[in-house]
Amino acid sequence: MSEPKAIDPKLSTTDRVVKAVPFPPSHRLTAKEVFDNDGKPRVDILKAHLMKEGRLEESVALRIITEGASILRQEKNLLDIDAPVTVCGDIHGQFFDLMKLFEVGGSPANTRYLFLGDYVDRGYFSIECVLYLWALKILYPKTLFLLRGNHECRHLTEYFTFKQECKIKYSERVYDACMDAFDCLPLAALMNQQFLCVHGGLSPEINTLDDIRKLDRFKEPPAYGPMCDILWSDPLEDFGNEKTQEHFTHNTVRGCSYFYSYPAVCDFLQHNNLLSILRAHEAQDAGYRMYRKSQTTGFPSLITIFSAPNYLDVYNNKAAVLKYENNVMNIRQFNCSPHPYWLPNFMDVFTWSLPFVGEKVTEMLVNVLNICSDDELGSEEDGFDGATAAARKEVIRNKIRAIGKMARVFSVLREESESVLTLKGLTPTGMLPSGVLSGGKQTLQSATVEAIEADEAIKGFSPQHKITSFEEAKGLDRINERMPPRRDAMPSDANLNSINKALASETNGTDSNGSNSSNIQ
């Protein structure tokens, strides 16, 4: 057995590892600073300012969002994009990794880009991603293209972090402008007349490319139907090795839309004379996945690309972009970049420190109430009859118990802050279940494990356990991949019949790793 390593005598255990953190710029960029004389954004100035966590005047942010939206509004549902092009997957508010993406993929000034959606939510720099990408869209309207993801909607941004982020960093007006802009995003792209590019995937109601062109996209995505499927659907977990003959089955992971099968993809490709489908929507350990090849073309029938490295700071995954040029497909991977730290849910330091302060205050209150012994209380109450004296004693004891319970709550909050954050992240509302804190440390840990197991996540998880693998992180985060409950979630009778039929044939397969090839010709 090896001996434990001794502490490096040169490593200080009293000094801060990070001695100082630069304060974000207090100055907000004005329109004169952001836009040149021709009304085009100065993206280099914008990038430098946002990298320092700087902000813009609200009128400037609104101008970028609305001008970008007006360009998006003029584009078709299905874009036609020529090669060469660099295709990017989910970003999810990871602005500093987005900057790394442009280093790997090439400058937008001389590189054609196609983004497959999910620019916001989960990460804490979503508004920076929107402002920068929309500024690039204004500057390069014919070479930078943005598709809609399932998170570009009111329902998910209210449920997750984007709305709260907009209100903290700017205002609800900026959030509303973003929602209007998201309604303008195209739904799909036809790349080089060979590849259909979407965020999620296929729909049983979309058989031809014209079916996409006919959709009304200028609205909040519905809870079912072809527009929902384009944004939400996934390939079957055992894609290419299906145990079902159905082309589409109910998507039990998302709680909406469908899983589509290898035969469904091959039939769609053959019917529309296409080579492959490029999509995002699912985190990948390597940043990408290539699925089973088409028997007619020998090319992967489906490719998933994911461009948010170390997703949520826990997945430990690589990110990737796909460069297609001269009929050669090249995958470029990259790792995460350092980024400023935000407390969970944009919490401020005063809220964060409240448990520490509260614990000390309640300790003092308990000590004040306990200043008299039972004998002293009894001697002071000789003037009262027995019933009154007993009642007074019980009132005081109840006060002490109440303060003691409050002290235990603050103590649990202080000692188990990581467990509290874990449990908050695993509950759909982001709130702790009632009575968890007052039950003490054991109740908190039990509730955390129950919350995880309720969503079929990894069993035996402990809040103190450090997540070490991609699959473990993906399992724990599974609850957040579902569509949150909404009022219009009930489909029409016709759609209900098809869903019931799909449910009857549902399977639970085990995924196999796709090809790890980085070049395809």
UniProtKB/Swiss-Prot annotation:
Residues 407-414 are annotated as: Autoinhibitory segment. It is a peripheral membrane protein. Signal peptide: none annotated. It comes from the Eukaryota. A motif (SAPNY motif) lies at residues 307-311. It is an enzyme of class 3 (hydrolase). Fe cation binds at D90, H92, D118. Binds 1 Fe(3+) ion per subunit. The keyword Repeat does not apply. Its main location: cytoplasm. Its cofactor is Fe(3+); Zn(2+). Its EC number is 3.1.3.16. Residues 327-336 are annotated as: Interaction with PxIxIF motif in substrate. Activated by Ca(2+)-bound calmodulin following an increase in intracellular Ca(2+). At low Ca(2+) concentrations, the catalytic subunit (also known as calcineurin A) is inactive and is bound to the regulatory subunit (also known as calcineurin B) in which only two high-affinity binding sites are occupied by Ca(2+). It is found in: Cytoplasm; Cell membrane; Cell membrane, Sarcolemma; Cytoplasm, Myofibril, Sarcomere, Z line. Forms a complex composed of a calmodulin-dependent catalytic subunit (also known as calcineurin A) and a regulatory Ca(2+)-binding subunit (also known as calcineurin B). There are three catalytic subunits, each encoded by a separate gene (PPP3CA, PPP3CB, and PPP3CC) and two regulatory subunits which are also encoded by separate genes (PPP3R1 and PPP3R2). In response to an increase in Ca(2+) intracellular levels, forms a complex composed of PPP3CA/calcineurin A, calcineurin B and calmodulin. Interacts (via calcineurin B binding domain) with regulatory subunit PPP3R1/calcineurin B. Calcium-dependent, calmodulin-stimulated protein phosphatase which plays an essential role in the transduction of intracellular Ca(2+)-mediated signals. Many of the substrates contain a PxIxIT motif and/or a LxVP motif. In response to increased Ca(2+) levels, dephosphorylates and activates phosphatase SSH1 which results in cofilin dephosphorylation. In response to increased Ca(2+) levels following mitochondrial depolarization, dephosphorylates DNM1L inducing DNM1L translocation to the mitochondrion. Belongs to the PPP phosphatase family. PP-2B subfamily. This is Protein phosphatase 3 catalytic subunit alpha. The gene is Ppp3ca.
